[in-house]
Amino acid sequence: MADLEAVLADVSYLMAMEKSKATPAARASKRIVLPEPSIRSVMQKYLAERNEITFDKIFNQKIGFLLFKDFCLNEINEAVPQVKFYEEIKEYEKLDNEEDRLCRSRQIYDAYIMKELLSCSHPFSKQAVEHVQSHLSKKQVTSTLFQPYIEEICESLRGDIFQKFMESDKFTRFCQWKNVELNIHLTMNEFSVHRIIGRGGFGEVYGCRKADTGKMYAMKCLDKKRIKMKQGETLALNERIMLSLVSTGDCPFIVCMTYAFHTPDKLCFILDLMNGGDLHYHLSQHGVFSEKEMRFYATEIILGLEHMHNRFVVYRDLKPANILLDEHGHARISDLGLACDFSKKKPHASVGTHGYMAPEVLQKGTAYDSSADWFSLGCMLFKLLRGHSPFRQHKTKDKHEIDRMTLTVNVELPDTFSPELKSLLEGLLQRDVSKRLGCHGGGSQEVKEHSFFKGVDWQHVYLQKYPPPLIPPRGEVNAADAFDIGSFDEEDTKGIKLLDCDQELYKNFPLVISERWQQEVTETVYEAVNADTDKIEARKRAKNKQLGHEEDYALGKDCIMHGYMLKLGNPFLTQWQRRYFYLFPNRLEWRGEGESRQNLLTMEQILSVEETQIKDKKCILFRIKGGKQFVLQCESDPEFVQWKKELNETFKEAQRLLRRAPKFLNKPRSGTVELPKPSLCHRNSNGL
C-alpha cells in the first residue's frame, strides 16, 4: 500500500510540474484581485515617502517597466523609437554567440542609428555614435557595445515623458500592483503541497504550487519545536537573512528564495525548485567525472560563489550534496543555513562539513572571510574527480583525523591530472590564505583567469549556454521515495511547548523578494489580471455616470488624501461599513457609494488618534468629545500605515492651529455633520 501511495504521489507531482511549465496561469486556483484605482491617492504618498517614485526605481522594476513601456508605445509618439531601441539592445545583450552579436549589432545600427543620422534626427551624442562605429569597424561586438546608448535613452525618458507617465492611468495601475505586492500575507492556504523531496535537521522540503499564479516551488518547512529543542533559533533566522541577501539580482547558480512566512508551528522558505538531484547522488550513480565534466560544474559554482561574495556572504558548506541540478542539468548552490555575512565583522566559528572545511575555519578563534569557500571549492572539485575528499583517505570517518590531515598534509595530486588542473587545485588547496588562489585581492576574478579555465566564455556560462555533461532523466522524480526519506519521530518534541516569547522571535520572519514576485507574476497571470481589471473598471465607470465619481470630490480642493476605508458602524458598533473618505486639514469627510449625504468629523471634535486592535486587525481609533469613539479599518497594510500617519499629522497640526486661534472658534459642535452631496465633475480614472 505504501508503494502505491508513493507512486501516486510521484505521478501527481510530475503532472503538476508538466502543467506548470506549459501553462502556469491555467493552474492558478486563486485570482489576484487589484484594488480600485482610487488606491493611487494613498499609494502615491506611501511610495513617495520611501523614495520609490523615481524614474530609476520604476523603470528597473519588471512591472514598472512593462507599464511605462505600454504608456510610451500607446500614448507618447516621440518615446516609441527610444523604447524599441532599448528593448533591441537588451535582447542583443542576451546573445552568447559572437557571430549572432555581429549580425544583430549591424541590424540595430542600421535601424536605429544610421537611419536617424541620414535624416539628421539622431537625438543621441556624438560620443555614443563614435563608440559604436569604432567597435563595429573592428568587429568588437561585446555584450556592452551599446551601453552608452542605454544611459542616454534612460536620460531622454526620465524628464517630461516620465512626468506624463506619472499623471496617467498606467501609473495608477502601477500603484494597484504595488499595493498587492506590499500586502502579501502568505499562509499554507496559498500553496498546494505535493510530495516530500528532502529532509534536514530541522524539517522537510516539499514540492509545491503557488495557488494564485500556478508556479512550482520548493517549500522548506522547519519545525519550530525541533528548532527550540536543538536551540537552533539563531541558525534558522540566519538562513532567512542570508537568503534575503543573495536572492536579489539575477543569479541562476544559487537556489534563491522568493518568500518566507511562518505558521504557529513552522518556518517556511519558498525556494527555487530543483528537480535534477544533487551532485553527491549523481556521483554515486554516474561515477567520477572527467576534467571536462568537472570544469562545467566548477564554472557555474564559481559564478554562484561570486554572487555571494559580492554581497559579503561566505557560504561555508560547499560540498557535492549541496549542489543541486535543475531539469536541464545546470547547477545551483543550495542550503544557506551555515552562510555568514562578513561585511561588518569576520566570522571565526568552526562550522561546515569535515573534509571540506578550510584550515582557518578549523583553527578556532581565527577570523576568516570568503577565503574559506575557495579552499572548500578545491576539496569539492577533487571529490568530483576522485570520489572522495582529498583529506579523507581510505573512507575514514574519524573527524579528528580528517581535520588533522586538513591542517598538516600536503595533498598529492595524481599524475593523471593535467598540469592546468594540478595548478588550479594546488592554488585552491593552499593552507596559507595569503598564497591561496582567490585570496590575493581579486576574488573570483583570480580563479576565473586561471589557465584551467582558458577558453571559457564566462558570459556564455552566465547565460547557461554550455551543454551540461549530465541531463537528469525526464519523467522521474530525482529524489528518494517518501518512505526512504523518512519522517521525524514526533515523540522527540512531545514535551516542547512554544511560548509567546518563542513566537516573538519570528515576528519579522515574513518576507517577499519584490523582484522575484514581480518576475513570477509577469511570467504567469499579469496580462490576464490586467485584462480582467480593465473590464471591471470599465463597468464601474459606466455605472458611476449615474452615481458620480467618488474621487472627483477631492479635485480642486485642499484634500490631503482620499480612498476607501471600513468604518465600524450601526448603533452597537458591530458591523464594518465600507465608505469613501476624504481627509482635509480641518476635517474628515465620508460617504457611501451612491449616498446623497456627506458626513463630517472636524478636527476640533477629536481628542486623540490612536492605534488599536479588533480581532487581530489593526485599526485607527478616534476618541471624540462627549465620550464617543470612531473606529476605522484599512483594507491593506500600506493603506493603514499611510492613513494612520496622515490622520495623526493632520490632527496634531489642527490642534496647534486651534490653540493659536481665537476662543470663539472653540464653541461646541455636534459629533458628526451631514452635508449635502456636492456637485461632481467627471474625470479620468487616475485616482486623483
UniProtKB/Swiss-Prot annotation:
Its EC number is 2.7.11.15. PROSITE patterns: AGC_KINASE_CTER, PH_DOMAIN, PROTEIN_KINASE_ATP, PROTEIN_KINASE_DOM, PROTEIN_KINASE_ST, RGS. It is an enzyme of class 2 (transferase). It is found in: Postsynapse; Presynapse. Interacts with GIT1. PANTHER family: BETA-ADRENERGIC RECEPTOR KINASE 2, G PROTEIN-COUPLED RECEPTOR KINASE/RIBOSOMAL PROTEIN S6 KINASE. This is G protein-coupled receptor kinase 3. It comes from Homo sapiens (Human).
